[in-house]
Regions:
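Residues within helix-turn-helix
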Residues: 47-48, 59, 66, 86
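Charged, amphipathic alpha-helical coiled-coil/dimerization segments
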Residues: 66-126
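Pre-recognition alpha-helix immediately N-terminal to the DNA-recognition helix
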Residues: 16, 35-38, 96
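Short capping segments at the starts of secondary-structure elements
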Residues: 42-46
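C-terminal regulatory/oligomerization modules of transcriptional regulators
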Residues: 119-139
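The alpha-helix within a helix-turn-helix
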Residues: 51
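N-terminal leader segment of winged-helix/HTH proteins
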Residues: 1-28
Length: 139
């Protein structure tokens, strides 16, 4: 039941974010690329760690990173202590996506605030924060 209840809001969120990024000039980005962007640390992240965080195979994550690298959103370099691993970092172009992404998220939140009354939206956000905190502690 939880999956069914979350499916439509998640799909709507991803669709709206994708449309916003296209409108901001990032038509080459797709929702699947969020698996990379959402899981990158500011100092860079190993592909294996990105894959673990996104709960996907290293090969699938490697393909996403390779595509984003070809487009200039990320760069990868050998890990300083493990030559077998690569560290992925946002490039200047990749960092430029952060502001429009945040603006799009704010726009979605504003739109959803119009679909729920004020108390419902506050409760929705409160419960999401609580769930996020609890799940973060479990990791």
């Amino acid at each position: 039941m939880l999956g069914v209840l979350l499916r439509q809001p998640l799909r709507a969120l991803l669709d709206e974010l994708n449309a916003g990024m296209v409108a901001a000039g990032y038509a080459d980005l797709r929702p699947a690329h969020s698996a990379v962007f959402m899981n990158l640390d500011t100092e860079g992240t190993r592909i294996t760690d990105l894959a673990d965080r996104a709960q996907m195979t290293k090969q699938s994550m490697g393909a996403l990173v390779s595509y984003l690298e070809q487009l200039g959103y990320v760069s990868s370099a050998p890990h300083p202590h493990d030559g077998r691993a690569k560290v992925v970092r946002l490039t200047k172009k990749g960092k430029a996506t952060e502001a429009p992404a945040r603006q799009n998220i704010s726009r979605v939140q504003e739109r959803w605030s119009q679909l729920l009354d004020k108390d419902e939206m506050e409760e929705f956000l409160r419960l999401l924060r609580k769930l996020n905190d609890v799940l973060q502690d479990d990791r």
